[in-house]
A protein has these predicted regions:
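Composition- and surface-driven signal marking solvent-exposed, interaction-prone regions
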Residues: 4, 124-126, 248-254
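Short carbohydrate-recognition loop motifs
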Residues: 195-207
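Short, charged beta-turn/beta-strand-edge "cap" motif at the junction between a beta-strand
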Residues: 238-242
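Short beta-strand and strand-turn-strand segments in soluble, beta-rich domains
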Residues: 209-218
Length: 268
């Protein structure tokens, strides 16, 4: 009896240890990674204040998560642990491997897509649902939620930022090209029938690493297919921006990507 209790206790301890949140931190920031491989929050530490970036905790919106749309709606795959701070998931023969890594002093993700199937992978779109809590539904909670303010796909790289109503700014950058970006809205409601009010609150910001053509000319035009045995790699970093006016300079210093700053666009 005692031996059985000892075995059960050991198993329960192992399960609780596996389910614990992983704390990943450096001097200027701290990330909490859930047992499911998604982020719970990022805290950027400053001398005057800390900026906390919240992430969704519910299964439908938490992230980063690998997803693909093959023509019949989005499919999202669960992460399987695959090493320290590393996870993998598979959709339609394509494996996505995500590893949390420090990059240029910033919290970042290395994302690898590899086609292990027998046919070319040609999704409507596929990539990451970032999982940043963008849902603004009530006062005063929305002051701490990050709204996708600017996202820009270039042929050689990607950059953008999210901003809270209270003025905090979070930059997102990749030195590799990203096909497109998109957002998911809440479902909406009928009130009264038959009138349907479409949802307008953002439930997810997505980085579409791949997207079917056509795309705007400024977007990369070769990320619509992943051939058998082919793999592509992206680094995606989160960057704390001191003020919105320092966005271009900060992103350029961190990632080395070309940026244009236009303090004024109209002269009278």
């Amino acid at each position: 009896m005692k031996k059985s209790c000892l075995i059960i206790g050991t198993l329960l301890w192992g399960m609780s240890a596996f389910a614990q949140t992983t704390i990943w931190k450096r001097s200027g920031w701290e990330c909490r990674i859930s047992d499911k491989g998604t982020l719970e929050q990022i805290v950027f530490k400053g001398s005057q204040r800390n900026d906390t970036v919240p992430f969704f905790h519910d299964k439908s919106n938490m992230g980063p998560s690998f997803y693909a749309n093959m023509g019949n709606g989005n499919i999202k795959a669960d992460w399987i642990p695959d090493g320290y701070r590393s996870y993998r998931a598979t959709i339609d023969g394509v494996e996505c491997r995500l590893t949390y890594k420090e990059w240029k002093g910033q919290p970042a993700m290395e994302v690898i897509l590899e086609n292990k199937g027998n046919v070319p992978f040609q999704p409507v779109k596929a990539g990451l649902k970032l999982g940043i809590d963008t849902y603004m539904d009530k006062y005063p909670d929305w002051f701490g939620k990050y709204f996708p303010t600017l996202m820009m796909n270039e042929k050689t790289h990607f950059y953008g930022y999210l901003q809270t109503p209270s003025g905090h700014t979070l930059g997102v950058v990749s030195p590799q090209p990203v096909a497109s970006w998109s957002v998911d809205y809440n479902l909406g409601y009928q009130d009264p029938a038959p009138h349907w009010f479409m949802g307008h609150r953002i439930e997810s910001l997505n980085l579409d690493l791949m997207n079917a053509l056509p795309l705007p000319q400024h977007c990369p035009q070769d990320l619509w297919i992943l051939k058998q045995g082919e793999r592509k790699t992206w680094t995606i970093a989160f960057v704390d921006i001191n003020t919105a006016g320092e966005f271009e300079e900060t992103i350029h210093k961190v990632a080395g990507v070309p940026m244009i700053r236009m303090p004024q666009t109209v002269y009278q």
